[in-house]
Protein backbone atom coordinates (compact mmCIF):
# COMPACT_ATOMS: atom_id res chain seq x y z
CA UNK A 1 0.00 0.00 0.00
CA UNK A 2 1.56 3.35 -1.01
CA UNK A 3 2.51 5.80 1.68
CA UNK A 4 0.06 8.69 2.05
CA UNK A 5 1.34 12.13 3.00
CA UNK A 6 -0.01 13.73 6.17
CA UNK A 7 -2.78 16.23 5.80
CA UNK A 8 -0.69 19.24 6.77
CA UNK A 9 1.66 18.63 3.84
CA UNK A 10 -1.01 18.03 1.20
CA UNK A 11 -1.72 20.89 -1.17
CA UNK A 12 -4.85 21.64 -3.12
CA UNK A 13 -5.27 23.31 -6.46
CA UNK A 14 -5.74 27.10 -6.45
CA UNK A 15 -9.40 26.89 -7.52
CA UNK A 16 -10.24 23.66 -5.64
CA UNK A 17 -11.71 23.44 -2.16
CA UNK A 18 -10.20 21.71 0.81
CA UNK A 19 -11.82 18.47 1.98
CA UNK A 20 -13.26 20.27 5.01
CA UNK A 21 -14.82 22.95 2.78
CA UNK A 22 -16.24 20.36 0.36
CA UNK A 23 -17.58 18.32 3.27
CA UNK A 24 -19.24 21.40 4.76
CA UNK A 25 -20.72 22.36 1.41
CA UNK A 26 -22.10 18.87 0.85
CA UNK A 27 -23.45 18.53 4.38
CA UNK A 28 -25.76 21.51 4.05
CA UNK A 29 -23.75 24.03 6.11
CA UNK A 30 -23.12 26.88 3.62
CA UNK A 31 -22.58 29.54 6.29
CA UNK A 32 -19.68 27.72 7.87
CA UNK A 33 -18.32 26.88 4.42
CA UNK A 34 -18.29 30.55 3.51
CA UNK A 35 -16.40 31.34 6.70
CA UNK A 36 -13.79 28.73 5.83
CA UNK A 37 -13.46 30.07 2.27
CA UNK A 38 -13.10 33.67 3.42
CA UNK A 39 -10.58 32.80 6.12
CA UNK A 40 -8.45 30.75 3.72
CA UNK A 41 -7.29 33.93 1.93
CA UNK A 42 -5.37 36.09 4.38
CA UNK A 43 -4.07 39.58 3.66
CA UNK A 44 -0.37 39.20 3.00
CA UNK A 45 1.77 42.31 3.35
CA UNK A 46 4.44 42.84 0.68
CA UNK A 47 8.04 42.58 1.76
CA UNK A 48 9.81 45.78 2.83
CA UNK A 49 12.14 46.92 0.05
CA UNK A 50 13.17 50.31 1.56
CA UNK A 51 16.29 50.15 3.69
CA UNK A 52 15.57 51.89 7.00
CA UNK A 53 19.28 52.58 7.59
CA UNK A 54 19.67 54.25 4.19
CA UNK A 55 16.46 56.22 4.59
CA UNK A 56 17.33 57.69 7.98
CA UNK A 57 20.96 58.30 6.95
CA UNK A 58 19.83 60.45 4.02
CA UNK A 59 17.30 62.19 6.26
CA UNK A 60 19.80 63.03 9.03
CA UNK A 61 22.54 64.26 6.69
CA UNK A 62 20.17 66.51 4.80
CA UNK A 63 18.67 67.78 8.06
CA UNK A 64 22.12 68.83 9.29
CA UNK A 65 22.90 70.52 5.98
CA UNK A 66 19.52 72.25 6.12
CA UNK A 67 20.29 73.69 9.56
CA UNK A 68 23.69 74.90 8.31
CA UNK A 69 21.97 76.56 5.36
CA UNK A 70 19.50 78.27 7.67
CA UNK A 71 22.41 79.65 9.73
CA UNK A 72 24.20 80.98 6.63
CA UNK A 73 20.99 82.54 5.36
CA UNK A 74 20.38 84.21 8.73
CA UNK A 75 23.93 85.61 8.74
CA UNK A 76 23.54 87.05 5.25
CA UNK A 77 20.21 88.66 6.09
CA UNK A 78 21.69 90.13 9.28
CA UNK A 79 24.66 91.65 7.43
CA UNK A 80 22.40 93.06 4.76
CA UNK A 81 20.05 94.68 7.29
CA UNK A 82 22.89 95.96 9.46
CA UNK A 83 24.61 97.76 6.58
CA UNK A 84 21.67 98.46 4.30
CA UNK A 85 22.51 100.12 1.00
CA UNK A 86 20.95 100.59 -2.39
CA UNK A 87 20.84 97.36 -4.36
CA UNK A 88 21.58 97.27 -8.08
CA UNK A 89 21.91 94.37 -10.46
CA UNK A 90 25.69 94.28 -10.15
CA UNK A 91 25.39 94.22 -6.35
CA UNK A 92 24.13 90.65 -6.50
CA UNK A 93 27.73 89.65 -7.20
CA UNK A 94 29.56 92.46 -5.42
CA UNK A 95 27.62 92.64 -2.15
CA UNK A 96 28.93 89.96 0.22
CA UNK A 97 25.73 89.98 2.28
CA UNK A 98 23.62 89.19 -0.78
CA UNK A 99 26.03 86.47 -1.88
CA UNK A 100 25.92 84.86 1.56
CA UNK A 101 22.12 85.02 1.61
CA UNK A 102 21.83 83.42 -1.84
CA UNK A 103 24.28 80.69 -0.88
CA UNK A 104 22.42 79.88 2.34
CA UNK A 105 19.03 79.90 0.61
CA UNK A 106 20.29 77.49 -2.07
CA UNK A 107 21.59 75.10 0.58
CA UNK A 108 18.23 75.22 2.39
CA UNK A 109 16.21 74.47 -0.74
CA UNK A 110 18.40 71.59 -1.92
CA UNK A 111 18.65 69.97 1.51
CA UNK A 112 14.88 70.41 2.00
CA UNK A 113 14.30 68.33 -1.12
CA UNK A 114 16.60 65.68 0.30
CA UNK A 115 15.22 65.23 3.81
CA UNK A 116 11.56 65.66 2.84
CA UNK A 117 11.93 63.16 0.00
CA UNK A 118 13.54 60.65 2.37
CA UNK A 119 10.96 61.26 5.10
CA UNK A 120 7.88 61.05 2.88
CA UNK A 121 9.27 58.47 0.40
CA UNK A 122 8.70 60.94 -2.43
CA UNK A 123 10.47 59.93 -5.63
CA UNK A 124 10.05 63.35 -7.24
CA UNK A 125 11.73 65.21 -4.35
CA UNK A 126 14.57 62.69 -4.20
CA UNK A 127 15.26 63.04 -7.91
CA UNK A 128 15.10 66.84 -7.61
CA UNK A 129 17.64 66.69 -4.78
CA UNK A 130 20.04 64.53 -6.81
CA UNK A 131 19.69 66.80 -9.85
CA UNK A 132 20.24 69.98 -7.78
CA UNK A 133 23.34 68.55 -6.12
CA UNK A 134 24.81 67.56 -9.47
CA UNK A 135 24.00 70.94 -11.04
CA UNK A 136 25.52 72.74 -8.04
CA UNK A 137 28.75 70.85 -8.50
CA UNK A 138 28.75 71.73 -12.21
CA UNK A 139 28.27 75.39 -11.23
CA UNK A 140 31.22 75.24 -8.81
CA UNK A 141 33.42 73.74 -11.51
CA UNK A 142 32.34 76.43 -13.98
CA UNK A 143 33.12 79.24 -11.51
CA UNK A 144 36.54 77.73 -10.81
CA UNK A 145 37.32 77.59 -14.52
CA UNK A 146 36.26 81.23 -14.87
CA UNK A 147 38.66 82.28 -12.12
CA UNK A 148 41.50 80.36 -13.70
CA UNK A 149 40.70 82.02 -17.02
CA UNK A 150 40.65 85.49 -15.46
CA UNK A 151 44.02 85.22 -13.75
CA UNK A 152 45.85 83.34 -16.47
CA UNK A 153 44.77 85.64 -19.31
CA UNK A 154 47.07 88.61 -20.06
CA UNK A 155 44.80 90.40 -22.52
CA UNK A 156 43.87 93.98 -21.69
CA UNK A 157 40.64 93.70 -23.66
CA UNK A 158 37.87 91.29 -22.87
CA UNK A 159 37.10 89.52 -19.63
CA UNK A 160 40.22 89.33 -17.48
CA UNK A 161 41.47 90.30 -14.04
CA UNK A 162 43.04 93.46 -15.47
CA UNK A 163 39.73 94.51 -17.00
CA UNK A 164 37.83 93.89 -13.76
CA UNK A 165 40.29 95.94 -11.68
CA UNK A 166 40.17 98.86 -14.12
CA UNK A 167 36.37 98.71 -14.02
CA UNK A 168 36.51 98.93 -10.21
CA UNK A 169 38.86 101.96 -10.38
CA UNK A 170 36.64 103.81 -12.85
CA UNK A 171 33.46 103.18 -10.82
CA UNK A 172 35.03 103.64 -7.40
CA UNK A 173 32.86 106.64 -6.56
CA UNK A 174 29.59 105.23 -7.99
CA UNK A 175 29.37 101.91 -6.21
CA UNK A 176 30.07 101.48 -2.56
CA UNK A 177 30.61 97.74 -2.89
CA UNK A 178 33.31 98.25 -5.50
CA UNK A 179 34.97 100.86 -3.30
CA UNK A 180 35.07 98.46 -0.35
CA UNK A 181 36.49 95.66 -2.50
CA UNK A 182 39.28 97.90 -3.85
CA UNK A 183 40.12 99.24 -0.40
CA UNK A 184 40.33 95.68 0.99
CA UNK A 185 42.64 94.58 -1.85
CA UNK A 186 44.97 97.59 -1.52
CA UNK A 187 45.23 97.29 2.25
CA UNK A 188 45.81 93.52 2.37
CA UNK A 189 48.02 93.20 -0.72
CA UNK A 190 49.89 96.51 -0.01
CA UNK A 191 49.34 97.86 -3.50
CA UNK A 192 47.75 100.87 -5.21
CA UNK A 193 46.20 100.94 -8.64
CA UNK A 194 46.10 98.10 -11.15
CA UNK A 195 48.75 97.15 -13.66
CA UNK A 196 52.11 98.89 -13.42
CA UNK A 197 54.68 97.49 -11.04
CA UNK A 198 56.39 100.83 -10.23
CA UNK A 199 53.67 103.37 -11.03
CA UNK A 200 50.44 101.52 -10.45
CA UNK A 201 49.01 104.38 -8.40
CA UNK A 202 48.72 106.51 -11.58
CA UNK A 203 45.79 104.30 -12.72
CA UNK A 204 43.61 106.35 -10.36
CA UNK A 205 43.86 109.16 -12.85
CA UNK A 206 41.08 107.32 -14.77
CA UNK A 207 38.70 107.77 -11.85
CA UNK A 208 36.13 110.54 -11.98
CA UNK A 209 36.84 111.41 -8.35
CA UNK A 210 40.68 111.44 -8.41
CA UNK A 211 41.64 112.57 -11.95
CA UNK A 212 43.79 115.68 -12.40
CA UNK A 213 41.76 117.33 -15.16
CA UNK A 214 40.71 120.94 -14.84
CA UNK A 215 37.04 119.94 -15.02
CA UNK A 216 37.24 117.87 -11.83
CA UNK A 217 35.48 119.77 -9.03
CA UNK A 218 36.08 117.08 -6.35
CA UNK A 219 38.30 117.87 -3.32
CA UNK A 220 40.10 114.52 -3.89
CA UNK A 221 41.47 115.85 -7.21
CA UNK A 222 44.93 114.40 -8.10
CA UNK A 223 44.80 112.16 -5.04
CA UNK A 224 44.51 108.45 -4.33
CA UNK A 225 42.29 106.50 -1.93
CA UNK A 226 43.26 106.40 1.71
CA UNK A 227 43.80 102.63 1.44
CA UNK A 228 46.96 103.33 -0.64
CA UNK A 229 48.74 104.84 2.39
CA UNK A 230 51.34 102.70 4.08
CA UNK A 231 50.44 101.26 7.47
CA UNK A 232 53.78 102.35 8.94
CA UNK A 233 52.95 106.02 8.37
CA UNK A 234 49.64 105.70 10.19
CA UNK A 235 51.15 103.73 13.08
CA UNK A 236 53.98 106.26 13.57
CA UNK A 237 51.52 109.11 13.64
CA UNK A 238 49.33 107.23 16.08
CA UNK A 239 52.24 106.85 18.53
CA UNK A 240 52.85 110.59 18.87
CA UNK A 241 51.53 112.73 21.71
CA UNK A 242 49.62 114.99 19.35
CA UNK A 243 46.11 113.54 18.86
CA UNK A 244 45.65 115.45 15.57
CA UNK A 245 48.84 114.11 14.00
CA UNK A 246 47.37 110.78 12.72
CA UNK A 247 44.55 112.60 10.93
CA UNK A 248 46.90 115.18 9.47
CA UNK A 249 49.39 112.52 8.36
CA UNK A 250 46.66 110.44 6.71
CA UNK A 251 45.57 113.49 4.71
CA UNK A 252 49.09 114.32 3.64
CA UNK A 253 49.89 110.81 2.38
CA UNK A 254 47.30 110.64 -0.41
CA UNK A 255 46.73 114.29 -1.39
CA UNK A 256 48.28 115.35 -4.72
CA UNK A 257 49.89 111.91 -5.05
CA UNK A 258 49.31 111.85 -8.81
CA UNK A 259 51.44 114.96 -9.30
CA UNK A 260 54.50 113.51 -7.50
CA UNK A 261 57.21 111.14 -8.66
CA UNK A 262 57.35 107.53 -7.44
CA UNK A 263 60.57 108.15 -5.51
CA UNK A 264 58.93 110.89 -3.48
CA UNK A 265 55.98 108.65 -2.55
CA UNK A 266 57.76 105.46 -1.58
CA UNK A 267 57.62 106.30 2.13
CA UNK A 268 53.99 107.49 2.06
CA UNK A 269 51.94 105.22 -0.27
CA UNK A 270 52.22 101.92 -2.15
CA UNK A 271 53.27 102.51 -5.72
CA UNK A 272 52.96 99.06 -7.31
CA UNK A 273 49.73 97.89 -8.93
CA UNK A 274 47.44 95.19 -7.47
CA UNK A 275 47.24 92.90 -10.52
CA UNK A 276 50.55 91.14 -10.01
CA UNK A 277 50.19 90.54 -6.23
CA UNK A 278 46.64 89.26 -6.79
CA UNK A 279 47.79 86.89 -9.52
CA UNK A 280 50.63 85.66 -7.34
CA UNK A 281 48.20 85.01 -4.50
CA UNK A 282 45.88 83.02 -6.75
CA UNK A 283 48.73 81.00 -8.25
CA UNK A 284 49.95 80.07 -4.79
CA UNK A 285 46.51 78.70 -3.91
CA UNK A 286 45.53 77.37 -7.34
CA UNK A 287 46.60 73.83 -6.44
CA UNK A 288 44.52 73.90 -3.27
CA UNK A 289 41.50 75.25 -5.15
CA UNK A 290 41.78 72.58 -7.83
CA UNK A 291 42.21 69.81 -5.26
CA UNK A 292 39.20 71.03 -3.29
CA UNK A 293 37.01 71.10 -6.39
CA UNK A 294 38.27 67.68 -7.46
CA UNK A 295 37.64 66.14 -4.04
CA UNK A 296 34.23 67.76 -3.86
CA UNK A 297 33.06 65.26 -6.45
CA UNK A 298 33.33 62.46 -3.87
CA UNK A 299 30.56 63.62 -1.47
CA UNK A 300 28.52 64.76 -4.46
CA UNK A 301 28.69 61.32 -6.06
CA UNK A 302 27.97 59.61 -2.74
CA UNK A 303 24.90 61.75 -2.07
CA UNK A 304 23.60 61.34 -5.63
CA UNK A 305 24.13 57.56 -5.59
CA UNK A 306 22.49 57.10 -2.18
CA UNK A 307 19.55 59.23 -3.24
CA UNK A 308 19.07 57.29 -6.47
CA UNK A 309 19.26 53.97 -4.64
CA UNK A 310 16.65 55.16 -2.16
CA UNK A 311 14.43 56.42 -4.99
CA UNK A 312 14.64 53.03 -6.75
CA UNK A 313 13.75 51.24 -3.52
CA UNK A 314 10.75 53.51 -3.02
CA UNK A 315 9.67 52.92 -6.61
CA UNK A 316 9.96 49.15 -6.24
CA UNK A 317 8.07 49.24 -2.94
CA UNK A 318 5.30 51.23 -4.59
CA UNK A 319 5.15 48.65 -7.40
CA UNK A 320 4.82 45.84 -4.85
CA UNK A 321 2.02 47.67 -3.04
CA UNK A 322 0.15 48.23 -6.28
CA UNK A 323 0.59 44.58 -7.26
CA UNK A 324 -0.68 43.44 -3.87
CA UNK A 325 -3.64 45.78 -4.20
CA UNK A 326 -4.48 44.25 -7.58
CA UNK A 327 -4.20 40.77 -6.09
CA UNK A 328 -6.49 41.73 -3.24
CA UNK A 329 -9.03 43.07 -5.71
CA UNK A 330 -8.97 39.83 -7.67
CA UNK A 331 -9.20 37.85 -4.42
CA UNK A 332 -12.21 39.87 -3.28
CA UNK A 333 -13.91 39.34 -6.63
CA UNK A 334 -13.20 35.61 -6.44
CA UNK A 335 -14.59 35.42 -2.89
CA UNK A 336 -17.62 37.40 -3.99
CA UNK A 337 -18.24 34.94 -6.83
CA UNK A 338 -17.89 32.02 -4.43
CA UNK A 339 -20.37 33.60 -2.05
CA UNK A 340 -22.77 34.08 -4.93
CA UNK A 341 -22.40 30.42 -5.87
CA UNK A 342 -22.98 29.36 -2.28
CA UNK A 343 -26.05 31.57 -2.07
CA UNK A 344 -27.40 30.06 -5.28
CA UNK A 345 -26.79 26.58 -3.85
CA UNK A 346 -28.67 27.61 -0.71
CA UNK A 347 -31.57 28.84 -2.81
CA UNK A 348 -31.63 25.59 -4.81
CA UNK A 349 -31.61 23.52 -1.63
CA UNK A 350 -34.41 25.59 -0.14
CA UNK A 351 -36.42 25.21 -3.38
CA UNK A 352 -36.00 21.41 -3.36
CA UNK A 353 -37.06 21.23 0.27
CA UNK A 354 -40.14 23.34 -0.41
CA UNK A 355 -41.11 21.14 -3.40
CA UNK A 356 -40.66 17.98 -1.35
CA UNK A 357 -42.80 19.34 1.49
CA UNK A 358 -45.50 20.47 -0.96
CA UNK A 359 -45.58 17.02 -2.58
CA UNK A 360 -45.84 15.39 0.82
CA UNK A 361 -48.86 17.48 1.84
CA UNK A 362 -50.73 17.08 -1.53
CA UNK A 363 -53.43 14.21 -1.50
CA UNK A 364 -52.65 11.20 -3.68
CA UNK A 365 -55.08 10.40 -6.51
CA UNK A 366 -56.70 6.90 -6.62
CA UNK A 367 -54.79 4.18 -8.38
CA UNK A 368 -56.64 3.80 -11.73
CA UNK A 369 -55.06 1.55 -14.29
CA UNK A 370 -54.50 3.09 -17.68
CA UNK A 371 -57.09 2.31 -20.36
CA UNK A 372 -56.44 -0.69 -22.55
CA UNK A 373 -55.99 -0.03 -26.24
CA UNK A 374 -58.79 -1.29 -28.52
CA UNK A 375 -58.36 -4.58 -30.29
CA UNK A 376 -57.85 -4.15 -33.97
CA UNK A 377 -59.16 -6.96 -36.16
CA UNK A 378 -57.37 -7.25 -39.42
CA UNK A 379 -59.71 -8.84 -41.95
CA UNK A 380 -58.30 -11.75 -43.81
CA UNK A 381 -59.80 -13.00 -47.02
CA UNK A 382 -60.01 -16.75 -46.96
CA UNK A 383 -61.59 -19.21 -49.28
CA UNK A 384 -64.79 -20.71 -47.96
CA UNK A 385 -65.67 -24.31 -48.53
CA UNK A 386 -68.51 -24.88 -50.83
CA UNK A 387 -71.77 -25.38 -49.04
CA UNK A 388 -73.16 -28.84 -49.21
CA UNK A 389 -76.67 -27.57 -48.90
CA UNK A 390 -78.43 -28.00 -52.19
CA UNK A 391 -80.94 -25.29 -51.53
CA UNK A 392 -78.24 -22.50 -51.11
CA UNK A 393 -77.35 -20.52 -54.16
CA UNK A 394 -74.00 -18.88 -54.84
CA UNK A 395 -73.78 -15.13 -54.38
CA UNK A 396 -73.76 -12.91 -57.32
CA UNK A 397 -71.05 -10.34 -58.24
CA UNK A 398 -73.24 -7.42 -57.17
CA UNK A 399 -73.64 -8.84 -53.72
CA UNK A 400 -69.87 -9.32 -53.44
CA UNK A 401 -69.23 -5.71 -54.46
CA UNK A 402 -71.74 -4.44 -51.91
CA UNK A 403 -70.04 -6.47 -49.19
CA UNK A 404 -66.62 -5.05 -50.12
CA UNK A 405 -67.97 -1.49 -49.98
CA UNK A 406 -69.44 -2.13 -46.54
CA UNK A 407 -66.03 -3.43 -45.39
CA UNK A 408 -64.26 -0.30 -46.57
CA UNK A 409 -66.85 1.95 -44.95
CA UNK A 410 -66.53 0.13 -41.65
CA UNK A 411 -62.74 0.39 -41.82
CA UNK A 412 -62.70 4.17 -42.47
CA UNK A 413 -65.31 4.98 -39.83
CA UNK A 414 -63.58 2.94 -37.17
CA UNK A 415 -62.32 4.95 -34.13
CA UNK A 416 -58.51 5.42 -33.98
CA UNK A 417 -56.62 3.81 -31.11
CA UNK A 418 -55.66 7.14 -29.51
CA UNK A 419 -59.27 8.24 -29.23
CA UNK A 420 -60.53 4.95 -27.81
CA UNK A 421 -62.88 5.13 -24.91
CA UNK A 422 -62.76 3.35 -21.62
CA UNK A 423 -62.27 -0.38 -21.27
CA UNK A 424 -65.31 -2.41 -22.45
CA UNK A 425 -67.57 -4.00 -19.88
CA UNK A 426 -68.48 -7.73 -19.89
CA UNK A 427 -71.93 -7.01 -21.39
CA UNK A 428 -70.35 -4.99 -24.24
CA UNK A 429 -67.92 -7.83 -24.89
CA UNK A 430 -70.80 -10.33 -25.22
CA UNK A 431 -72.65 -8.00 -27.58
CA UNK A 432 -69.57 -7.62 -29.76
CA UNK A 433 -69.14 -11.37 -29.97
CA UNK A 434 -72.79 -11.81 -31.03
CA UNK A 435 -72.42 -9.10 -33.64
CA UNK A 436 -69.24 -10.76 -34.92
CA UNK A 437 -71.03 -14.09 -35.27
CA UNK A 438 -73.90 -12.49 -37.20
CA UNK A 439 -71.47 -10.85 -39.59
CA UNK A 440 -69.66 -14.10 -40.13
CA UNK A 441 -72.92 -15.76 -40.95
CA UNK A 442 -73.74 -13.14 -43.51
CA UNK A 443 -70.25 -13.45 -45.10
CA UNK A 444 -69.31 -9.81 -44.22
CA UNK A 445 -66.39 -10.87 -42.01
CA UNK A 446 -64.20 -13.79 -43.10
CA UNK A 447 -64.15 -16.81 -40.91
CA UNK A 448 -61.04 -17.99 -39.14
CA UNK A 449 -59.29 -20.87 -40.66
CA UNK A 450 -59.60 -24.16 -38.91
CA UNK A 451 -56.44 -25.87 -38.27
UniProtKB/Swiss-Prot annotation:
Residues 366-376 have a biased composition (Pro residues). Residues 1-56, 118-130, 307-451 are cytoplasmic. InterPro entries: Tetraspanin/Peripherin, Tetraspanin_EC2_sf. GO terms for biological process: nematode male tail tip morphogenesis; positive regulation of BMP signaling pathway; positive regulation of egg-laying behavior; positive regulation of embryonic development; positive regulation of vulval development; regulation of mesodermal cell fate specification. Residues 78-96, 152-285 are extracellular. Glycans are attached at residues 205, 211. A motif (Basolateral membrane targeting) lies at residues 20-24. Pfam families: Tetraspanin. Expressed in the germline, particularly in sperm cells. It is a multi-pass membrane protein. It is found in: Cell membrane; Cytoplasmic vesicle membrane; Endosome membrane; Early endosome membrane. Functions redundantly with tsp-12 to regulate cell surface levels of the BMP type II receptor daf-4 (but not BMP type I receptor sma-6), probably by regulating endosomal sorting and recycling of receptors, preventing their targeting to degradative lysosomes. Together with tsp-12, regulates cell fate specification in the postembryonic mesodermal M lineage, body size, male development and vulva development, probably by positively modulating BMP-like Sma/Mab signaling. Together with tsp-12 involved in maintaining the structural and functional integrity of the endosomal network. Belongs to the tetraspanin (TM4SF) family. This is Tetraspanin-14. The lineage of its organism: Eukaryota, Metazoa, Ecdysozoa, Nematoda, Chromadorea.
Amino acid sequence: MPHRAPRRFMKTAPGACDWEQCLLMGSGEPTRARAVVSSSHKQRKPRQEISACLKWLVFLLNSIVFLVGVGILALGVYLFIKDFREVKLVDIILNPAILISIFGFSICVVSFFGFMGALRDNIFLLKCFAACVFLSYILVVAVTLVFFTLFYTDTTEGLSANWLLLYAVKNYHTNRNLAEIMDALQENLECCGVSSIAQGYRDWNMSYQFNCTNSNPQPEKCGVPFSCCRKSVISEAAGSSNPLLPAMRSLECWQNALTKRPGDLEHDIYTRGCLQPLRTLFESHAVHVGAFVALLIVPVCISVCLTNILAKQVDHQRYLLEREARRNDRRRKRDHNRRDQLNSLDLLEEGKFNNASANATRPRPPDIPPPLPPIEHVPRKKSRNASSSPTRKPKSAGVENAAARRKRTATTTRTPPAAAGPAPTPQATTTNRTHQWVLQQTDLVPQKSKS
